[in-house]
Amino acid sequence: MYKERSGGGGGGSSRSEILGGAIDRKRINDALNKKLEKSSTSTTTSRVFSSKDKDPFSFTSTKTQLPDVESETDSEGSDVSGSEGDDTSWISWFCNLRGNDFFCEVDEDYIQDDFNLCGLSGQVPYYDYALDLILDVDASNSEMFTDEQHEMVESAAEMLYGLIHVRYILTTKGMAAMTEKYKNCDFGRCPRVFCCGQSCLPVGQSDIPRSSTVKIYCPKCEDISYPRSKFQGNIDGAYFGTTFPHLFLMTYGNLKPQKPTQSYVPKIFGFKVHKP
């Protein structure tokens, strides 16, 4: 692919180091944002979510040679550069990265249908290169890329996959894939005591990329909370959207639990606290 895939031996960062340590996505996106500052009039965005990060990338990509970008950091193993072996697809590898448990594997036939990708080319930098990376298509001029350019393409591929994913999970196949994860409690359980460990669903508070991180929605108490894992807590909420959990429960009504019958009652020395 765009970068030599790291194996279990040899030099450089191993897969275990990448999966076991803190994923260095901020550094990759800082480089991508610097490129956007130089090449586009779009609003500069950061990978760190804040109140001013409201606009998605407004950058139209064309498949031309990428200009050189100065690197401010040493070259390190990327978390989205490719799979360990040629027999593993990029999609499978990406979904199995630590912290990406919420993602399901999007069918490649779905990605190859241009209709399903309508409007995404204007939101994702280096769209063509990112799409090739996701589909494991070798680029003829990928060997000309610098490490910094590789990282920017890889970051764009992560963003593109997330924006495709939020559409896919609203389809019949996508919901079926998410059903298995829901039944296995892959999205976590509600921390509320009276929900008794109810399995949750991922939800975004906004459909705009880089506005907020993903949360988990409890269909029992109908409230949201933060994921327990710090890795999952860094995922963009727009990759799951505001619609998914509610459409999912409408589609699979048999999976919707009953409302909790108990609620906590505050007491002082055994007496209920008066509510004014």
From Swiss-Prot:
One of its GO terms (biological process) is regulation of circadian rhythm. Residues 1-22, 34-86 are annotated as: Disordered. One of its GO terms (molecular function) is protein kinase regulator activity. InterPro entries: Casein_kin_II_reg-sub_N (IPR016149), Casein_kinase_II_beta-like (IPR035991), Casein_kinase_II_reg-sub (IPR000704). Phosphorylated by alpha subunit. Pfam families: CK_II_beta. GO terms for cellular component: cytosol; nucleus; protein kinase CK2 complex. It is found in: Cytoplasm, Cytosol; Nucleus. SUPFAM superfamilies: Casein kinase II beta subunit. Keywords: Cytoplasm, Nucleus, Phosphoprotein. PANTHER family: CASEIN KINASE II SUBUNIT BETA (PTHR11740), CASEIN KINASE II SUBUNIT BETA-3 (PTHR11740:SF22). Belongs to the casein kinase 2 subunit beta family. Plays a complex role in regulating the basal catalytic activity of the alpha subunit. The tetrameric holoenzyme CK2, composed of two alpha and two beta subunits, phosphorylates the transcription factor PIF1 after an exposure to light, resulting in a proteasome-dependent degradation of PIF1 and promotion of photomorphogenesis. CK2 phosphorylates translation initiation factors. May participate in the regulation of the initiation of translation. Stimulates the binding of CCA1 to promoters. Heterotetramer of two catalytic alpha subunits and two regulatory beta subunits. Interacts with CCA1. Interacts with LHY. This is Casein kinase II subunit beta-3.
